[in-house]
């Protein structure tokens, strides 16, 4: 059985990965705070290291030594939504330098890092970005994530992607924001080619099992959709009365071209209908537990 360490098991990606992987792999995870503060976090079949501080010297190495994992999936990061409120040095360290520290440890200990990058390394001026396109983001978040991309190590696979999904604690992402609204502008010229967090978990599972030697930088994406259609289709599935006004006076196309990844792995991205159906079921299931 594969032995996997998820760094950052309470975030939007980390908590989904942990819940999905726990029945498939020997699983370990790090938590920023005490385990008892996460009421909705799965606590069975996972060996947690709580109160984890990335700034504490040698702690990451100690945890890796304790786990001896085959794979480390790095979900630790300061997100775009809170980057402007965060310390510049902290953003650059956590998003830019910490992945390199983990990669060096992986090389020493003969394990493999899966580093998660973002479509936000691009400005969004043109879309259909390939791995060869020059990263042209100029905001603090985008620049920090550019620094964290590892392209030339046998010990690291960097996946450039974008994701949507539910959160369990800090709710800053698109979906949690959307669910709290009554009326919004839906951007018809904001193009998105991401995956749900649940689909990305399946992608990473496939890599670890079928393509463990894959390394370097790869884009992973779905078929592009504009955010108006994305949110409108989700609201219809949920039968939520959220008024979505079509808004065209904003353009941003960070869509990724994942032809290289598809050719290498045979991956077939699911339709948005399928991904949103799964996401809507997760939302409705969570709503039921709150009653």
Please place each PLM-identified region on the residue numbering.
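Mid/C-terminal beta-alpha module of Rossmann-like enzyme folds, strongest
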Residues: 203-206, 210-258, 287-288
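Catalytic helix-loop patch of NAD(P)-dependent Rossmann-fold dehydrogenases
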Residues: 93-100, 120-159, 164-166
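NAD(P)H-binding glycine-rich loop region in Rossmannoid oxidoreductase-like domains
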Residues: 51-94
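Amphipathic terminal alpha-helices
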Residues: 2, 272-291
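N-terminal Rossmann-fold cofactor-binding loop
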Residues: 29-39, 53-54, 77
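SDR active-site strand-loop-helix element
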Residues: 7, 30, 75-76, 113-119, ...
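N-terminal Rossmann NAD(P)H-binding glycine-rich loop of SDR-like oxidoreductase domains
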Residues: 2-24
